[in-house]
Each structure stands twice: as structure tokens, then as C-alpha cells.
């Protein structure tokens, strides 16, 4: 006999619940979630939520796990409805809810609902800095107050800061360049929060944050300055050489030449004695060369003020800018043509080469 997971009584063969118990449980979830939604809309006091939660627990088989899941669901819904500017009333409301709902913070946040709420509020406070409504220190102070109620890991905190930086970058780069005042704001932001525009995690590659870092470097090169952001690269640089950028997971291909002889065999054969045949003529042919691109492996492509440097597990190569006679850009890489005798073409694949083209244009 199966046992009902709600009331604990016999549920019959091959069954784990009574239909009426399941319906009562579903009704309880609807009642609880409706009350929580009403609370976040400001229409129901917290005392009523506590009463409803106790009632459905006793009469509708609502467990603490159910209460946590319903709380998480309704918090996500509330997070999607509130918008910047945020006020202390938002923080007071969630603080009151967490303190009185009767389940742990960790259980409510099992799916990350409280983290998402905190990150959204932090982005809002940082938006006030980028729009000139608050100094950065004040926005940071308010964010720290929020995180005392809604704690975040360092990783999730930085995710919120980076996401706001990306939104700011999208606005700043509408015309392709940042103004001096916008650059100053970005420098203060990343300097204060310990962020970077060049040593980015893979998830931020190809985002406005990467574009801002590249735009800042190009602006410094154009002005004759050493770029303000230092790239920590595991390569040996020459005297006066500075590393600007690094593209990871780049595949290098190098042109190879295959030579073979193509021709035909002429002449005829005749029998001399049994078992012995004599053949006249011979092979006439000519060499034919074909070129192909050989995969040289995956590695990192570094851009400096003097070279393009590829560091891979199978092969590494340094290409001086002075030896480059042409670059053919692709949507996902570039072909490099070099000066010199018997120098083969190189293809680098797996990145947007726009930044390299701009560096070459400014340096040369």
C-alpha cells in the first residue's frame, strides 16, 4: 500500500497521494502566494502573512519547503516589477518579510531570488553615480547597507558592478568614443571597486565593457600616452614594449606547401624468354605544388605596441608590425601577410580583429 505524502494515510496501491489532499495542497499554495503578492504590493500587512502561513500549514499541508519556494517565487515577481530609483522602503519591506516569514534566509534564497533582488538594487544605486545624481562613495555606501540585509558573495557582487558598467559603456560608446568626463567616471568606478577593463572573465568578452577598455587604449595611443591599463601577460617583452590586449582561445593556421609529381608512364613491353619481360620507355612528369592551411593549435594572441605574439601549446610566433604588409579581416579573425622570401601566410581565428586594425593604423 502506498502512503499519501500529504496526510500520511494509506493511499492505495501504486499511489502516493489522495486526490483531495493534492487539491487541498494546491489551494493552500494559491492562498499563500496570493497573500505574499498582496504584501509586496503594500495591500496586506506582514501580520496577515504570518496568519495565512500558519493557517495553510495546518489545513493545507503546506510545508516549510513549500513556504520557502512560494516566498522565492513571489520575491522574483516583485523584483521584476520594481525599478530604479530604489528607496529605503524597498529594503524595509524585504527585511520585514525575511524576519517574519518563518523560514531561513538560505532556504528562501535556494534559487537565488534574494541575490537577484540585491543585484538589481545595487545596479540602481550605481546608475545614480553614472547619471551624476550621487557621488560614487555615497552609492557604494548605500549598496553596502543593502548587502547587510541581502548578503552577496564577492563574485555576485562583482557581477552586479560589471553589469552596471556594461550598461554605462553601452551609453558612452554610442558615438564610438568616450568623452573625457565619461572616461574619468569609468576610471574612478573601476579603480574604487577593484574592477578591470582588460583582464576580463570569458563571460564579458565581446561586451561593451571590452569595447570600453579597447577605446581607452586607442585614445591613449592616439594622444601619445602609455595606456592607462596594464595588461599582465606571461610573455617576455622587449625594451620599450607594452602589452595592450590579449585574446584567448585563438586558433592559428599557417600556410603549408605540398609538392608532388604528376605525369604518365610511356613505352611498351615484350617478352624475351619465359618469365622475363622487357619494358621500354619511362615515367615523364612535372612537379605540382598545392598550398593548404595547417592547424597549429589553440593559444593566446597578444597585441603590443611592436608585435602580434601568438603563444600556443604546439607553436608560438612573434610578428613585428614592420614585417606586416597586409591584413585581411574576417568576421571571426584575420589573415596576416608578411614581407620576406618564402614567408607563409598566417590566419588567426576566434576573435574580432577591429581593435588590432585600429592599433596598426595609429602606430603606423
Model regions and ranges:
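Short metal-binding segments enriched for Cys and/or His
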Residues: 25-37
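Amphipathic, non-membrane alpha-helical rod segments
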Residues: 46-64, 77-105, 132-152, 178-199
Amino acid at each position: 500500500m502506498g502512503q499519501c505524502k500529504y496526510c500520511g494515510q494509506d493511499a492505495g496501491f501504486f499511489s502516493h497521494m489522495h486526490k483531495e489532499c493534492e487539491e487541498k495542497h494546491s489551494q493552500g499554495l494559491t492562498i499563500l502566494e496570493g497573500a505574499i503578492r498582496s504584501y509586496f504590493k503594500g495591500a496586506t500587512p506582514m501580520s496577515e502573512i504570518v496568519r495565512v502561513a500558519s493557517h495553510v500549514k495546518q489545513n493545507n499541508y503546506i510545508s516549510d519547503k513549500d513556504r520557502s519556494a512560494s516566498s522565492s517565487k513571489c520575491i522574483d515577481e516583485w523584483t521584476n516589477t520594481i525599478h530604479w530609483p530604489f528607496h529605503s522602503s524597498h529594503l524595509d519591506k524585504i527585511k520585514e518579510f525575511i524576519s517574519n516569514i518563518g523560514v531561513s534566509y538560505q532556504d528562501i534564497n535556494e534559487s537565488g531570488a534574494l541575490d537577484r533582488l540585491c543585484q538589481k538594487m545595487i545596479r540602481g544605486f550605481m546608475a545614480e553615480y553614472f547619471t551624476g545624481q550621487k557621488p560614487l562613495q555615497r552609492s557604494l555606501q548605500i549598496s553596502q547597507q543593502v548587502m547587510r540585509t541581502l548578503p552577496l558573495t564577492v563574485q555576485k557582487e562583482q557581477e552586479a558592478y560589471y553589469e552596471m558598467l556594461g550598461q554605462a559603456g553601452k551609453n558612452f560608446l554610442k558615438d564610438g568614443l568616450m568623452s573625457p568626463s565619461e572616461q574619468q567616471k569609468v576610471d574612478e568606478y573601476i579603480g574604487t571597486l577593484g574592477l578591470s577593463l582588460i583582464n576580463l572573465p570569458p563571460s564579458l568578452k565581446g561586451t561593451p565593457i571590452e569595447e570600453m577598455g579597447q577605446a581607452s587604449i586607442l585614445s591613449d595611443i592616439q594622444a601619445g600616452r602609455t595606456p592607462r591599463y596594464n595588461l599582465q601577460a606571461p610573455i617576455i617583452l622587449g625594451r620599450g614594449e607594452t602589452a595592450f590586449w590579449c585574446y584567448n582561445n585563438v586558433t592559428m593556421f599557417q600556410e603549408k606547401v605540398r609538392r608532388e609529381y604528376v605525369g604518365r608512364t610511356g613505352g611498351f613491353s615484350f617478352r624475351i624468354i619465359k618469365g622475363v619481360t622487357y619494358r621500354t620507355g619511362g615515367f615523364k612528369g612535372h612537379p605540382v605544388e598545392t598550398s593548404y592551411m595547417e592547424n597549429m593549435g589553440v593559444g593566446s594572441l597578444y597585441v603590443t605596441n611592436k608585435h602580434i605574439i601568438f603563444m600556443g601549446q604546439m607553436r608560438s610566433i612573434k610578428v613585428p608590425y614592420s614585417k606586416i604588409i597586409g591584413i585581411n579581416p574576417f568576421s571571426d579573425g584575420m589573415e596576416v601577410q608578411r614581407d620576406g622570401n618564402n614567408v607563409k601566410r598566417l590566419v588567426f581565428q576566434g576573435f574580432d580583429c577591429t581593435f588590432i586594425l585600429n592599433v596598426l593604423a595609429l602606430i603606423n
